[in-house]
């Protein structure tokens, strides 16, 4: 049998994969990150069906008595859909985010109300992550919200974030949040259902990578070598997953359109790409 690209990248020992997958299934505190493409349609309008599916998936975790924090993109995209045109300047992008963020939160509020759940909005900048006192205040607020069974919905505060204080990417924001709140699992939902050896939208021979661990450098090299902007967009997701794995937290990159995707993770199914702690051990 000929060796595939996935084989050449090296594999994670199955015992390590199974242990990390079990830890992911048993995670008590989960950070879920949803990207813009997981929430909007091709015209950048907020897609009600996509948002409701995300909430349905999160509600399943809540019913399993898990704490869930949602890091949600989509504000600028939702703003474009509401206003009717895109941004040409930083100021326009920031203004669109304010329009879109309010619309996004209104829809989240409505959708979670179907499950008699309340939500709270938290907007952050890089300064909030870097300043110990401010980050501690953020974590304390999150703890209180979770004690009240309220779902924190987190996004970057685009309206006030200048280039110097921008986090720049919600993949990195979700990684920082997961570490800061002592999460047991980070799930990044995207419009591609896993990390592949190529862009699955363009390459029919692209293979799903089941797990990433000690083979991270090869995976990172593969992603960075890609010339496709669509596939290249997964780079920060891979980096964010790697970051939390350094703290003993399993991470999964999976498709937002996958049926019952969070339920599959919570029941130990093999879905998406699993990032195990890089020391090859799962967190105790």
Swiss-Prot record:
Substrate binds at residues 73, 158, 170. Keywords: Amino-acid biosynthesis, ATP-binding, Cytoplasm, Kinase, Nucleotide-binding, Proline biosynthesis, Transferase. ATP binds at residues 33, 190-191. It catalyses: L-glutamate + ATP = L-glutamyl 5-phosphate + ADP. One of its GO terms (cellular component) is cytosol. Disulfide bonds: none annotated. Pathway: Amino-acid biosynthesis; L-proline biosynthesis; L-glutamate 5-semialdehyde from L-glutamate: step 1/2. It is an enzyme of class 2 (transferase). It comes from the Archaea. It is found in: Cytoplasm. Pfam families: AA_kinase (PF00696). The keyword Amino-acid biosynthesis applies. GO terms for molecular function: ATP binding; glutamate 5-kinase activity. Catalyzes the transfer of a phosphate group to glutamate to form L-glutamate 5-phosphate. Belongs to the glutamate 5-kinase family. This is Glutamate 5-kinase. The gene is proB.
């Amino acid at each position: 049998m000929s060796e595939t690209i996935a084989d050449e990248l090296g594999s994670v020992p199955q015992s390590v994969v199974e242990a990390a997958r079990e830890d992911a299934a048993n995670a008590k505190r989960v950070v879920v990150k949803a990207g813009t493409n997981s929430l909007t349609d091709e015209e950048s309008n907020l897609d009600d069906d996509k948002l409701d599916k995300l909430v349905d998936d999160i509600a399943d975790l809540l019913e399993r008595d898990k704490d869930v924090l949602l890091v949600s993109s989509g504000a600028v995209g939702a703003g474009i859909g509401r206003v009717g045109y895109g941004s040409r300047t930083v100021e326009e992008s920031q203004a669109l985010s304010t329009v879109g963020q309010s619309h996004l939160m209104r829809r989240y509020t409505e959708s979670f109300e179907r499950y008699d759940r309340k939500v709270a909005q938290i907007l952050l900048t890089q300064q909030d992550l870097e300043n110990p006192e401010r980050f501690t205040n953020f974590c304390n607020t999150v703890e209180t919200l979770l004690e009240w069974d309220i779902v924190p919905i987190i996004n970057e505060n685009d309206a006030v974030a200048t280039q110097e204080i921008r986090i720049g990417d919600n993949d990195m924001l979700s990684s920082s949040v997961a570490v800061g709140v002592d999460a047991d699992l980070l799930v990044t939902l995207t419009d591609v259902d896993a990390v592949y050896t190529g862009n699955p939208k363009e390459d029919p021979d692209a293979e799903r990578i089941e797990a990433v661990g000690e083979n991270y450098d090869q995976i990172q090299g593969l992603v960075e070598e890609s010339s496709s902007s669509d596939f290249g967009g997964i780079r920060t997701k891979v980096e964010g997953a790697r970051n939390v794995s350094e703290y003993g937290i399993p991470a999964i990159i999976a498709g937002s359109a996958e049926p019952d995707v969070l339920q599959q993770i919570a029941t130990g199914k093999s879905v998406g790409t699993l990032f195990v702690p890089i020391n090859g051990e799962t967190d105790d």
